Amino acid sequence: MTYLIAFAIIFLLAVVVIQIGKLSELSARIRGEEAEERSVNNTQGMALVAFMVVFLIACVWSAWAYKDQMLGYGPLTSASAHGFELDHIFNVTLFFTGIVFIITHILLFWYSYKYRKVNNTDKAMFFAHDTKLEMIWTVVPAVVMTYLVANGLIAWNNIFPTLGPDSKHIEIEATGYQFAWDIRYPGADGKLGNKDFRLIDPANNSLGVDWKDEASVDDIILGGSDKIVLPKDSTIKVRITAKDVLHNFYLPHFRVKMDAVPGLPTSFIFTPVKTTKEFREQLSKFPEWQVPADPADPTGPKKWETFEYELACAELCGKGHYSMRRIVEVVEREEFDTWLASQKPFYVTNIRGKEYDPWAGKKLFPFEIKARANELKSDIANYLSDTTGTASRNIQLKHVFYATGSADLNSDLSKYELDHLVELMAKYPSLKVELAGHTDNVGDAASNQVLSNSRAGNVLSYLLSKGVNSGRLSAKGYGQDQPLESNDSAEGRQANRRTELRIISK
């Protein structure tokens, strides 16, 4: 129905225009062609001058009235170090193009009036060549363009400095795809691992990260809805790429904008200089940000209180283009370090211990050893300090490994957790524990009982060899009788093959 009404309106307007044209022709015949033409020319000339005045005033007024809603003006000053320089370049460019804009429009409409046809003897002036005029419109734009380009090159070099291995910067990676961004942070080593598109597995490795590269195993990957967190006053280098179509990595408040092209990695370097909290306080000083964020809830939070930095895709990439918006939060460096330390590496949560883990049974990484040591220390301390009886006395030794199908202890990998257990036993001299061995239900129950006994005994022998008093230790195998998970799946059977620390007395 809406389309039908719109079509009818357009049709009626066309009829009106045609009828006005016919009336003009009829009027010209009655009044005389020359007089009518002179009248029309005068009317149009004056109308064009009036339009020029109204148009230029409207342009200047609207620019001034809405300046606080444009990037670079009012409260929307740059939130990055380089952004101030870019805003200055835009202002300089606006100054020169504004002069051309105003002069061009004044001449355009004034000449339309001045050189309107008044008499049949009037003729347009024509000249084929004017050296002075050609020099002016060649040299002046060339000088202005040279100045603008030179300033742009200087700014470009300032924005993209050479970052060496000793540069104290944070390198992250943004991968665009329909319709989200995956953001990868380096772990404790400060390095992003390698990627290879041939390793992409939509179910388990959507970025194609090479897990054989040790720099990859502590990398942190944020999914499509996780908040992106950045530190204030720290240099950030963003690797930008895409998996499917052309995207664009756009952080408007930081003056960051770079295409994300499949197969062609790009990058951008910037330094945030205002936290999200500081930018909100800046916005709060302007009346247009003091209105309710939700007009339907006048008593709710103000607009400035709900402000968030954002990452957008500035390339029309498909019907879900709008959903690529991500929240960006800038915090102080200490808060960022705390947040980053709380994030678990993708490898640990999604790859470690699976059949496609290239390091299974081969290596423990420093961040794993440290995290497990803290976890074991916390578990024991929580039980010893518990007065409610809710803390579990059973603590799984997650980094104790054996040869497949054997009771032989893999000392190279198990030593880290067991040595830390020795330290905790020394810290708590009254602590007595039982080492409990468990298996899955593969094979017969009697063999599993023997295997679990032997494995628990080998752990006990290791602890004794490190000087732990034998009176504080005991070992027992429980075979397949106490499963944690169902033995119907490989993951369940793996969870049931374990060694536990059972606290007997505090």
Question: Language-model segments: what does each one mean?
Answer:
Residues M1-D68:
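Transmembrane alpha-helices
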Residues E33-V40, I57-L94, G98-V100, H105-F367:
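Non-transmembrane, membrane-proximal soluble domains of secreted or membrane proteins
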Residues K132, E305, Y309, S414-E417, ...:
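Stable alpha-helical elements in mature extracytoplasmic
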Residues P141, A174, V238, Y402, ...:
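Conserved hydrophobic/aromatic pocket- or pore-lining residues that grip, position, or stack substrates
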Residues I240, C317-G320, L340, V422-M425, ...:
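Sec/Tat-exported extracytoplasmic proteins
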Residues G353-K432, K506:
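Periplasmic peptidoglycan-binding/tethering modules of Gram-negative envelope proteins
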Residues T404-Y416, A426, K432-K506:
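Periplasmic OmpA-like peptidoglycan-binding domain that tethers envelope proteins to the cell wall
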